[in-house]
Swiss-Prot record:
The gene is tgt. The active site is at D90 (proton acceptor), D274 (nucleophile). Substrate binds at D90, S91, G92, G93, F94, D144, Q197, G224. GO terms for cellular component: cytosol. Pathway: tRNA modification; tRNA-queuosine biosynthesis. It catalyses: 7-aminomethyl-7-carbaguanine + guanosine(34) in tRNA = 7-aminomethyl-7-carbaguanosine(34) in tRNA + guanine. This is Queuine tRNA-ribosyltransferase. It comes from the Bacteria. Gene3D superfamilies: Queuine tRNA-ribosyltransferase-like (3.20.20.105). Zn(2+) binds at C312, C314, C317, H354. Binds 1 zinc ion per subunit. It comes from Leptothrix cholodnii (strain ATCC 51168 / LMG 8142 / SP-6) (Leptothrix discophora (strain SP-6)). InterPro entries: ArchSynthase1/Queuine_TRR, TGT, TGT-like_sf, tRNA_ribo_trans-like.
């Protein structure tokens, strides 16, 4: 089940409300990524506290471990990971693409060796739909081939040609039809999204988009971006494609990106975003703040008593209030620098909490700006603040 209400617009930017089987999602929204059924380093209750409304699961990796049988035993991913709100699962197409020469693509699907134990596996649109039905995710993604920006090995390959992108895009369209047919055969009560492909070629993007609209999916994603292309190429496709999708359906930009990418994506008509950047960067000492990015490993933070971001209300920056009124948490840059230098587990946990809170709070501010009819003013101030530097 999916219902999308478009509440207000400003230019291409949209404020909406997405109703799914496990709850309501206010858009635009950022979706934290839980590859193996967990958002790394963060408890589910903390995700809810910081405003996460929907999270991602990774079909490919959950198929590898723990497998369909365990997922079926638990009745799906929600009970398995103790998350009661909506979940989106990707189809496995991107992960198969990332295997490189370890996989062989045909009309039927993709053959590859399991990266876990070397078993020979065959992933098809039908199998992807079957796995995602067992996972019982609120939003299911069609099985697609992620069109790469670069063909072949680094330094000896070539940028994907229009002919190569067309072959890949047309295969994804045939797989979209097969995904939809299998999804219907299984009686899956959730929502299936189609994925626009076409590489860096706008004409192919439009061809893919129009064909998917003919198939009439409940929602649509723009895939094949942030796959190694230069930033200006990604921005060109981001400016071209999302606003051409049906206005009455949710629009999802896959795997993007930086805080600036999210705000610019909203301006291009995107409703939904996901990216591993908040947690991956956190584990490497890279923190996002209102006034730019902060590298906590730098020696200049060794004795700095300030929080990461004095405007942030997350547990790492401000702490939380206990029932007896005492405040717990709220840590200095010096302490977080110390944890990072010593390799202490608490360091990346607090950094992940901060980065996710920053992303989720940014999208809350975007929604409030759209509600107030001042999104472009917010966007300008956001960029000025980020450029100021910490």
């Amino acid at each position: 089940m999916l219902n999308f209400d478009l509440l207000t617009t400003e230019g291409h930017a949209r404020r909406g409300r997405l109703t799914l089987n496990h709850g309501v999602v206010e858009t635009p929204i950022f979706m934290p990524v839980g590859t193996y059924g967990t958002v790394k380093g963060v408890m589910p209750r903390d995700l809810e506290t910081m405003g996460a409304q929907i999270i991602l699961g990774n079909t490919f990796h959950l198929w590898m471990r723990p497998g369909q049988d365990v997922m079926a035993q638990f009745g799906g991913l929600h009970r398995f990971e103790n998350w009661t709100r909506p979940i989106l699962t990707d189809s496995g197409g991107f992960q198969v693409w990332s295997l490189g020469e370890m996989r062989k693509i045909s009309e039927e699907g993709v053959r590859f060796a399991s990266p876990v134990n070397g078993d020979k596996l065959f992933l098809t649109p039908e199998v992807s739909m079957q796995i995602q039905t067992v996972l019982n995710s609120d939003i299911v993604m069609q099985f697609d081939e992620c069109t790469p920006y670069w063909q072949g090995a680094k330094n000896v390959g070539h940028i994907t040609t229009e002919k190569e992108a067309r072959v890949s895009m047309e295969l994804s369209l045939r797989w979209a039809a097969r995904s939809k047919a299998e999804f219907a055969r299984l009686g899956n009560p959730n929502a299936l999204f189609g994925i626009v492909q076409g590489g860096m070629f706008e004409s192919l993007r439009e061809e893919s988009l129009n064909a998917l609209v003919e198939l009439d999916f409940p929602g649509y994603a723009v895939g094949g971006v942030s796959v190694g292309e230069p930033k200006d190429e990604m921005l060109r496709i981001m400016n071209h494609t999302p606003h051409l999708l049906p206005a009455d359906k949710p629009r999802y930009l896959m795997g993007v990106g930086t805080p600036e990418d999210l705000v610019d994506g909203v301006a291009c008509g995107v409703d939904m975003f996901d990216c591993v950047m908040p947690t991956r960067n956190a584990r490497n000492g890279h923190l996002f703040t209102r006034y730019g990015d902060l590298k906590i490993r730098n020696a200049r933070h060794k004795a700095d008593e300030r929080p990461l971001d004095e405007t942030c209300s997350c547990q790492a920056c401000k702490g939380s209030t206990l029932p007896d009124g005492r405040v717990t948490g709220g840590f200095s840059r010096a302490y977080l620098h110390h944890l990072d230098r010593c390799g202490e587990m608490l360091g990346p946990m607090l950094a992940s909490i901060h980065n996710l809170h920053y992303y989720l709070n940014l999208m809350r501010e975007v929604r409030e700006a759209l509600d107030a009819g001042r999104f472009e003013a917010f966007r300008a101030q956001f960029k000025a603040d980020r450029a100021r530097g910490v």
